[in-house]
Curated annotation (Swiss-Prot):
Belongs to the DDOST 48 kDa subunit family. This is Dolichyl-diphosphooligosaccharide--protein glycosyltransferase 48 kDa subunit. Component of the oligosaccharyltransferase (OST) complex. The keyword Magnesium does not apply.
Amino acid sequence: GPRSLVLLENLNLRDTHSLFFRSLADRGFELTFRTADDAGLSLIKYGEFLYDNLIIFSPSIEDFGGNINVETITAFIDGGGSVLVAASSDIGDPLRELGSECGIEFDEERTAVIDHHNYDISDPGQHTLIVADAENLLKAPTIVGKKALNPILFRGVGMVADPDNPLVLDILTGSSTSYSFFPDKPITQYPHAVGKNTLLIAGLQARNNARVVFSGSLDFFSDAFFSSAVQKAAPGSKRYSQTGNYELAVALSRWVFKEEGVLRVGAVSHHRVGELAPPNAYTVTDLVEYSIVIEKLSDGKWIPFDGDDIQLEFVRIDPFVRTFLKRNGGKYSVQFKLPDVYGVFQFKVDYNRLGYTHLYSSTQVSVRPLQHTQYERFIPSAYPYYAGAFSMMVGLFMFSIVFLHMKEKEKSD
């Protein structure tokens, strides 16, 4: 199974967060538990990654042990590794640095997300035990799961996404009444995060399809929050016997560790309609058929992907043709007429959808002009020129006859 390194604040977390770790182990993950300051830690050995996934459940760590640091974790992400990070109000510098590398800014140490309208009935008084509604989740079933969830319990630090980073995903936002500040101090300055800008859980899919999820709450993954009842403190609020934390945590782990939302390109073929093999070069205005097999990873097996919005572009610097691919059994195909332009073109499928890995396929082909023998003998648009040429010939012939056979009358003296 996928090799996963779990860095813990202390080994007690194995017991307090056992349901989450058991769900991973049941899905075949090989979990290696270490404390985050263990002197023997290593992610990379001889240029090879020792693990496929990294789970960091050690919010307050000030220095990782062994040869792990923010640079090696960033290199791990650059190499396609998956990382799940859980923080808390007691957050150390390494996690803050890792967040800023990924376009996410954590609030200061000792701050918490506060919501005076959406806190749980069991909150001790600081209104930091927040009930997050499922409506605030990102609308992406591949990331947050397909079923409707009960409200989610959250207690931890707030985050803000870098507005210039288009890769950051706002997976769970605070409500419009939430903000992030020190829970035990009066507010003297504008909070770091206010309203919907407050991120409780954020994600990132890098351009190399590496995935990272940041949760501002370590308690979010705890057995206590998984099995707790939840009810907002507002009068008349509905009581739920269980939170939606477990279902959301499992869905997030399936996505971040690439069990969900992974696409790949299978066989690609192209040829003239009526033929089976691709030619050395196409001719302008040929009728062409293109087909591509796209597969999705599901429970460890590759199955045909079902999408109705996959487009094919026929590109020579700019697209000359852009058309939807139609599903035909296990593959997508389309027939279209090549443009009346010759050059070097590409069949390009560039499919980028929320929650799925970036799918890209390009096949280069040549399109040549018609050979001289392929043109029609007479072109309708040239009829005026033909008429002009033939009328000139006929006119010259008639003029010649008249000129040659006309005698001038002799002048009489």
